[in-house]
């Protein structure tokens, strides 16, 4: 167990944001994020488990690797000494080679001017030196081999160092670096959140007061973090004007926006922006419309079979809120009801490309008794009122087709909520409350396993 300043085996960290997800997907890395939840002051409490076998199980491999690296280092040093010696010898060999060539040239040039005796002496000397020529060539070849071997040893040493680093065989210093890296990753847990059960809603954050009593505002739930555009739709029926602000700051100041004029008017406030398109309910129909902002055109529209519309099955506040579209971590949803379901809330997964219903669930909860609803991680959360004193009262789990009654209060500051939607990118609830655009942070509690267990 690696010694820490907090009681092992848990490392607790406070990171600003919301509840977090597993930061290490590979259990071989050792560190695990076990739970995370949001504290009352809005900080994310991340709990990391440090396995006891962090280095002990690697001691044998680490020791063998260090011994191998020491051997390679010794060989490398010996190669450097040998190279230095052969370099000096090679200079002498090259001098001898030059001398032989000089003698051979002189012998050829003086063939006719030397006496027979002198010529024979030179010839005999050259004959003695000739066998040395092949020796010199072999010596030069061996020298080149030594140079190549030195490079191979150097490369091997670098590879072993990389392996050692990968195995984490640096003892205390290595673990210290790993802890620092872990802390950095844990501090980013708000940007790497996983799914969990809703256990709390923060105090409201009023972003702006703009527009009428009813409306909707949102950001793209699937845009990259650099894209902070805000869309604003005032009113709950027959509207066609959508304002697109460049950033949240521009929305607050009411500047730098463009206008989209929808070809067909909307009904209700249950719109959502998903992957560059607006999904909304066409006025006086049960038709879902997908409007693409960049091309300023309707890409597809489709009826929801049997879905009520035109205030047939609205939320408790009315406002043509028969159909409510939502996006969570798993995709696009529609919340509505039908005569066949006796006015109970139906949750359907929609294909975002074709708008076809992929699967539906009957929650058993009467829609007219619901103030608003939102989806988080495949769970539909329903409030019991749109007025003051409202709380998250009911949860339906699509993964198990089961439900439970909850008691999660939240502060309805302006006493009339007409839009409540969860943004999975920002892990926040967007609310239109009596002409005020409001944000809530949420607390998600979850237990995460990195060992492959569900």
UniProtKB/Swiss-Prot annotation:
Function of the protein: Involved in transforming growth factor beta (TGF-beta)-induced smooth muscle differentiation. TGF-beta induces expression and translocation of OLFM2 to the nucleus where it binds to SRF, causing its dissociation from the transcriptional repressor HEY2/HERP1 and facilitating binding of SRF to target genes. Plays a role in AMPAR complex organization. Is a regulator of vascular smooth-muscle cell (SMC) phenotypic switching, that acts by promoting RUNX2 and inhibiting MYOCD binding to SRF.
Residues that carry a glycan: 74, 155, 275, 310, 399, 441
Coiled-coil residue spans: 58-85, 136-193
Taxonomy of the source species: Eukaryota, Metazoa, Chordata, Craniata, Vertebrata
Localization: Secreted; Synapse; Membrane; Nucleus
Post-translational modification (record): N-glycosylated.
Keywords: Coiled coil, Cytoplasm, Disulfide bond, Glycoprotein, Membrane, Nucleus, Secreted, Signal, Synapse
Domain spans labelled Olfactomedin-like: 194-446
Main localization of the protein described in the UniProt heading: secreted
UniProt GO BP: positive regulation of smooth muscle cell differentiation; protein secretion; regulation of vascular associated smooth muscle cell dedifferentiation; signal transduction
Effect the entry attributes to changing residue 86 to M: In a colorectal cancer sample; somatic mutation; no effect on secretion
Induction or repression: By TGF-beta.
Signal peptide from the UniProt entry: 1-20
Subunit composition and interactions: Peripherally associated with AMPAR complex. AMPAR complex consists of an inner core made of 4 pore-forming GluA/GRIA proteins (GRIA1, GRIA2, GRIA3 and GRIA4) and 4 major auxiliary subunits arranged in a twofold symmetry. One of the two pairs of distinct binding sites is occupied either by CNIH2, CNIH3 or CACNG2, CACNG3. The other harbors CACNG2, CACNG3, CACNG4, CACNG8 or GSG1L. This inner core of AMPAR complex is complemented by outer core constituents binding directly to the GluA/GRIA proteins at sites distinct from the interaction sites of the inner core constituents.
Tissue: Expressed in aortic smooth muscle (at protein level). In the fetus, expressed in the brain and ocular tissues including lens vesicle and optic cup.
Name of the protein described by the UniProt record: Noelin-2
Record-level GO cellular component terms: AMPA glutamate receptor complex; cytoplasm; extracellular region; extracellular space; nucleoplasm; nucleus; synapse
Disulfide partners: 195-377
